[in-house]
Amino acid sequence: MSGALVELVSKGAQDVYLTTSEGMSFFNLKYQRHTNFSQAPKLIKEISTEDVSIIIPVYGDLLNAVWFEGVDLLNSFFGAKFSLYIGGQKVDSYDFDYSSDIWQNYLADTYTKSQEINNKCSTTNPNFLSLHYFFGDNQSFIPLVALQFHQVEIKIDFAPGASAQNIRCYGNYIYLDAEERKRFTNKKMDIIITQCQQIKKTLDCDDTEYYEEKATEAQNEYNEANTLLQALQTADPPNNTAINAQQAIVDTKLALYNAAQATSTAYTSPTNGYNDIDISQFNHPVKSLFFGFTTKQAVVEKDFLSFKSADIQINGTPLLENMSPLYFHIVQNYNHTKFGIIQYDEDKDCPFYTRYFAYHFCLDASSYKPTGTCNFSRLDNAKIILRNVKKGYERAETEELIIYAVNYNILRIDKGMAGVLFAN
């Protein structure tokens, strides 16, 4: 007798609560038929720093993805801003670091998308960049067929000095059958959309370790230069031209080291890295908050952002208190995303692939549908408190902390036109 048959008949009183002959079967093959459609990619246009407006042509009925292809898009778009307009009204806008440092680490809706990291820390494919508006992920779309009197436009604000040539913008278009197309054109629609809001604040850091590490780095550079000088001086025969040139380098490195050491010795932190950041200007039901700064290189100790503890307060009442950096990355991703990147540098208490931390009001940040929000429009005040903030020694002496809020809004489409229902 097979052990599987023994298992099958070995049922008792407790199993009444678990199984029934009338229950759901795991062995029914079910599927749903869908309406007829087709899809195809189309080249929208080539852009450069001199041609930054992309008018979306109506090549199909729906648009469900927009992306760029080119050479070294990471450096071309670094520091850029991407803004979406419908009928001349700005619907959404975000900086490059939202798509390079935040979206893949905290909001990706598939594993494949979460692995497509392109920032100064990790580069999967620098020749590809996808846009992340309310359409393009989670099988969402924008119904171009219903916008007979409004055009869709994407504007790019490149960073000063950026070089961008022969960048191709593509879109993925959906083509519908006549009956479903008629439904889109005749029906008023209220579409849930996401938007990005942003606040910037000069960051107060405890730079004691920052200046100590700068002095150590300057000392190492001086020692390396001096070692090379000694090797040149003991060479036989000596090269006086090379010795004189290296001596000048050593003198410069010594002066830089002495200056760095003097700065480190004299430095005292005026605030101990305490930051009280007002975020009351955010509006609408917010699903997620992100705070940090743009990743500028892969070596974490040179580039990191960390703090001892953080609070979030709403209407003067603590929502959370004295939470660690680990909580705002590992715990948030572990509990609130399906595909978040959880890697973390324990020595510097900083995420490995981003310099942003997160807090989610929602249950599932990867989902397009609402699973929880905090309506900032109904708050009198809100703030984030960061204590003992520290940064990597190759960051600028003065850094801006960037806080993003991802909120929900409603895009109403009616009679060939569209508009955002709730303004700021």
Spans of features found by a protein language model:
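Short, low-complexity Pro/Thr/Gly
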Residues: 1-209, 262-424
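Extended amphipathic alpha-helical heptad-repeat regions
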Residues: 205-263
